[in-house]
């Protein structure tokens, strides 16, 4: 018999540095799963991506078991790193805080493609370009 899915919990945590403290503890504790087992598994899986925020999707089952699936870092995070900035513009349409090239845009789109609702790389590029525009990052050829 298949296990019954109870909940899907989505968290954004620093890679390799998850702890049982909030937000992890309260989010997972209410479903009765072993928090330390999750923290250990997450830190092992995300150790290679140190320094970035790595979203995780945790499927919790009725027998208190779980499956953690790592997603790609948020587009805004990848864009900030590519542009070499700390944060986006406070007034995006009026001010430009950084620039990225088309090649960098394509690389970010390729990295994000598995987690995006896009059919091809061009559609993914347009989505990432929109995120860049809303952050005040200009795309140059």
From Swiss-Prot:
One or more lysine residues are methylated. Disulfide bonds: none annotated. Transmembrane segments: none annotated. GO terms for molecular function: large ribosomal subunit rRNA binding; structural constituent of ribosome. InterPro entries: Ribosomal_uL11, Ribosomal_uL11_bac-typ, Ribosomal_uL11_C, Ribosomal_uL11_C_sf, Ribosomal_uL11_CS, Ribosomal_uL11_N, Ribosomal_uL11_N_sf. The keyword Cytoplasm does not apply. One of its GO terms (biological process) is translation. One of its GO terms (cellular component) is cytosolic large ribosomal subunit. Keywords: Methylation, Ribonucleoprotein, Ribosomal protein, RNA-binding, rRNA-binding. Part of the ribosomal stalk of the 50S ribosomal subunit. Interacts with L10 and the large rRNA to form the base of the stalk. L10 forms an elongated spine to which L12 dimers bind in a sequential fashion forming a multimeric L10(L12)X complex. PANTHER family: 60S RIBOSOMAL PROTEIN L12, LARGE RIBOSOMAL SUBUNIT PROTEIN UL11M. Forms part of the ribosomal stalk which helps the ribosome interact with GTP-bound translation factors. Belongs to the universal ribosomal protein uL11 family. This is Large ribosomal subunit protein uL11. It comes from Chloroflexus aurantiacus (strain ATCC 29366 / DSM 635 / J-10-fl).
